[in-house]
A protein has these predicted regions:
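C-terminal-of-GTPase-core extension/linker across diverse P-loop GTPases
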Residues: 1-12, 17-170
């Protein structure tokens, strides 16, 4: 677990024939809470009978058990046969690039305007919560700050909507 603090990208290798263990989820949760980039590699893929079904199952279990890991890439490989092993390094480099990405304030503000127009923040005490602007405070991990008139009153569900939208769009 200490190695996670020193890592920039963590590759969590899972066995395709095993269910998500509690320990796997604990490690993934720790990686995310430490602000590290996470990539999930599912090994022994050559032994899987129904690949599409099993991969869908991995995505569903990850989404259910660890909603903050939404959008984490999952690659399948077989160390024994060498299948898809050449995709591992490019996937690591790609996720590192995303983790290291800087987005301009202007781009973020245009994005915020679109998101708040399509799905406005809720009212609080009869007053509309106005999201004034957004900026990227730091990268590694990408950290964003939204300024508003009632920032303490913004519901967690709306914050999650913004976070998930950021992940999808950038």
């Amino acid at each position: 677990m200490r190695a996670i603090k020193f890592a920039q990208v963590v590759v969590l290798i899972l066995d395709a024939q095993e269910k998500f263990e509690k320990q796997d989820l604990t490690i993934a949760r720790r990686v995310i809470s430490e602000g590290r980039a996470l990539l999930i590699a599912v090994n022994k893929w050559d032994l899987v009978k129904n690949p599409k079904e099993i991969l869908g199952d991995f995505h569903n279990r990850l989404a259910k058990s660890l909603p903050q890991a939404r959008g984490v890439p999952i690659i399948t490989l077989s160390a024994k046969t060498g299948s898809n092993t050449k995709k591992l390094l490019p996937a690591v480099l790609n996720i590192y690039e995303l983790w290291n990405k800087r987005i301009s304030t202007g781009t973020l503000n245009r994005w915020l305007d679109i998101k708040t127009t399509n799905h406005p923040p809720p009212l609080h005490g009869g007053r509309r919560i106005k999201l004034r602007y957004i900026t990227q405070a730091k990268n590694r991990p990408p950290t964003f700050v939204v300024f508003s008139n009632l920032s303490n009153e913004l519901p967690i569900s709306y914050s999650r909507y913004l976070v998930n939208s950021l992940r999808e769009d950038f």
